[in-house]
């Protein structure tokens, strides 16, 4: 059998939100690469997919540093991309799992840049965190002619402020460590009442805040925290 690499999206966190296709592929893999935020640490993505793995699957956890050291991250991306390619060339069925959707703000994208687009690569999409949040909070992402923007809160304040003015509905990702700044921008735009924040959507620790003005600026938030804004939606308590 020819080797193949699958980039498998795990969805937002609940194991039963994995796609049927991803679950089927997970059960057939020879090798699964699972990212971990720190050396020797647990992999959230692996905990999501573990029950779908076949007995034959060898799991390899790989550490992707969260530091600002560009050279360190480049070295890891190069190493993992080379390892994935070598396994495929050896005829293995290989998977790499990533939270949410593989093509949205994911570590996988940096590997894709190095691997390219060979015929032996398949990318399996998944439920995004903000799609899950919208469903859990019963808040539509966009209605009729509304524009929808997905913004990383790592962007400059001026760009975020401009997006808040230009778009009808927004997803503000990577809120962790930046909540006070984002809350202030929402207040300046008069949008606090149009926004909600959810952390760890679909996971056991899920939390939702519908009144952001009541959330202290220095409140500790989980890493997976996202804000949704819809200027034309009123939530019925």
Curated annotation (Swiss-Prot):
Keywords tagged on the record: Cobalamin biosynthesis, Methyltransferase, S-adenosyl-L-methionine, Transferase
EC identifiers of the protein: 2.1.1.151
Pathway it works in: Cofactor biosynthesis; adenosylcobalamin biosynthesis; cob(II)yrinate a,c-diamide from sirohydrochlorin (anaerobic route): step 2/10
Coiled coil: none
InterPro entries named in the record: 4pyrrol_Mease, 4pyrrol_Methylase_sf, 4pyrrole_Mease_sub1, 4pyrrole_Mease_sub2, CobI/CbiL, CobI/CbiL/CobIJ_dom, Uropor_MeTrfase_CS
Top EC category: transferase
Self-association state and partner proteins as the record states: Homodimer.
This protein's name: Cobalt-precorrin-2 C(20)-methyltransferase
Organism: Salmonella typhimurium (strain LT2 / SGSC1412 / ATCC 700720)
Name of encoding gene: cbiL
